[in-house]
Amino acid sequence: MNKMLHNLTLHTLGACALMIAAGSASAAEKMTLGVSIPTATHSFTAGIVWWANKAKEDLEKAHPDLKVIVKTAANAPEQANQLQDLLTVNKMDTLVIFPFESASLTKPVAQVKQKGVYVTVVDRGLTDTSAQDAYVAGDNTAFGKLPAEFIAKTLNGKGDIVALRGIPTTLDNERFEAFTGVMKQHGGIKILDAKYGNWNRDDAFKVMQDFLTRFKHIDAVWAADDDMAVGVLKAIDQAKRSDIKLVFGGAGAKGAIKTLMDGSDPRIQANVSYSPKFMYDAIMLTAEARLKGERLPANTIIPSVLITPQTAKEFYFPDSPF
């Protein structure tokens, strides 16, 4: 597999989308593009669904011979079944998939690829990369590294912290490994525990309740997701704990960015970008390449950056579901 990372700025991605909208490529024959994504169970996946349907709208308007079918799944088995429907019923020749889970979707995606379908995997990578043609994602290493650096600096290299993880996926592993890699450089910081919160505010609330019961002093929390940060803050407030000075979420949800902008919660001091718009970008880039009879680079990584109160306005999109 080509290991070279093809870094694209959002500006470049936007330009690609405009080229599609302008009808820069024409299909020689009818093409069916299947899009498989999780259901909107929280604000980030709501953004994924919204951007996927936006891509469908833009592409079908620009290309009458292109059919885009968007399917959402509530769990991994349902998503695997939908892949078979897209293949046998809808006769797709191209697939863009945001896997519900990495391990359980790898074999179903591989089976689709073996039937000659071009496969672009988005965000949650598969455990076997030979099951895909292309991979488009945010910078998961930076997503873990930047918060770790910020927390370490804020704590002056000393303190007790807890961490939340998402769902067992390759991207969660990348984020956590990057986070702990930075923390290993700061011997004065102790990670008391890390547990999965499933990128869900209710699950994160329960995880944080457990942390608060077991640990009588916590300096900071890496919530690793803005939805999970909501659950974390709720648990802290209910427990009336004043020792926790910093809660770092992630992905740039509009509620979190608004809080960062207006300074209404001193525990929210920074964020890290990871917009669900990359779903739109992945679909548009894949369609553009396939309409031209071309392939995407093996890896397209969209940069993540630290969001501060000074830069928050650039990342605030009030009309977005995320």
Q: What residues fall within each predicted segment?
A:
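N-terminal signal peptide c-region/cleavage motif recognized by signal peptidases
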Residues: 21-24
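Bacterial N-terminal signal peptides that target proteins for export
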Residues: 1-13
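A residue-level marker of the well-folded mature domains of exported/periplasmic proteins
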Residues: 3-6, 27-322
